[in-house]
């Protein structure tokens, strides 16, 4: 695992990296991600420059690397990180890593919905929560299906690690996150796949027993409505 202290690279070196791959959407004047032909990815963070920004003291790239370490310790599949860099005299940090094998759930929903196993996917979310892991920005685009019933995570800059299973209220908020994406929900419905929320609720019923299911689903609906 690369050090949390980035290697300083020149602007020329950065340009060589940028021109060697396919650029993703631009953010703060730089591509958020670069996809390379050798199945590696370069993720970029153009650090916020405000004095009160926490990224001044703890860059997002460092959080990403640390989260990868902690997730691996919990048995979660994450990309193998290759290098950690910062452009000289600049606020841009970069992390290069090997792509996880497989396809995102989002890709599969569009092109091969028959390969999506909703019960096992719901179980994966449940297992994360039981381990005390809250991936705040989780959605079907950053959950990778490595093989049937086997998953991994990408783009995990913002993750919390609790020392106990995630409380139900926070689980509901987390489950609401992927259900805010209308195109994903549309694909789920059009593919006649089992309902994702119902699959998660069924796991809760079997493992937790009595809980306020109405309050749980109400929290999810409120979160979805708030963000839509």
Give residue spans per PLM region.
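Short, solvent-exposed loop/turn segments at secondary-structure boundaries
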Residues: 54-56, 109-113, 165-167
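Juxta-kinase regulatory segment immediately upstream of eukaryotic protein kinase catalytic domains
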Residues: 1-22, 217-227
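Soluble or luminal CAZymes and related metallo-dependent hydrolases
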Residues: 59-63, 117-120, 192
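Conserved protein kinase catalytic/activation segment
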Residues: 142-154
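Conserved ATP-binding subdomain of kinase catalytic cores across diverse folds
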Residues: 13-101, 126-131
């Amino acid at each position: 695992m690369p050090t949390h202290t980035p290697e300083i690279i020149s602007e020329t070196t950065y340009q060589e990296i940028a021109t060697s791959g396919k650029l993703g959407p631009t953010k703060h004047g730089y591509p958020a991600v670069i996809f390379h032909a050798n199945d590696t990815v370069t993720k970029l963070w153009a650090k916020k420059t405000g004095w009160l920004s926490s990224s001044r003291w703890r860059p997002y790239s460092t959080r990403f690397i640390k989260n990868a370490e902690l997730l691996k310790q919990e048995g979660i599949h994450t990309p193998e990180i290759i290098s950690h860099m910062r452009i000289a005299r600049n606020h841009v940090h970069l992390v290069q890593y090997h792509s996880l094998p497989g396809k995102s759930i989002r890709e599969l929903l569009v092109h091969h919905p028959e390969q999506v196993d909703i019960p096992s996917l719901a179980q994966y979310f449940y297992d994360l929560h039981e381990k005390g892991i809250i991936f705040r920005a989780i959605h079907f685009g950053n959950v990778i299906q490595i093989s049937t019933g086997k998953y991994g995570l990408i783009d995990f800059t913002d993750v919390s690690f609790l020392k106990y299973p995630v409380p139900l209220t926070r689980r509901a908020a987390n489950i609401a996150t992927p259900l805010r994406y209308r195109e994903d929900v549309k694909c789920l419905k059009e593919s006649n796949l089992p309902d994702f929320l119902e699959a998660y609720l069924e796991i809760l019923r079997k493992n937790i027993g009595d809980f306020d299911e109405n309050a749980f689903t109400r929290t999810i609906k409120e979160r979805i409505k708030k963000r839509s």
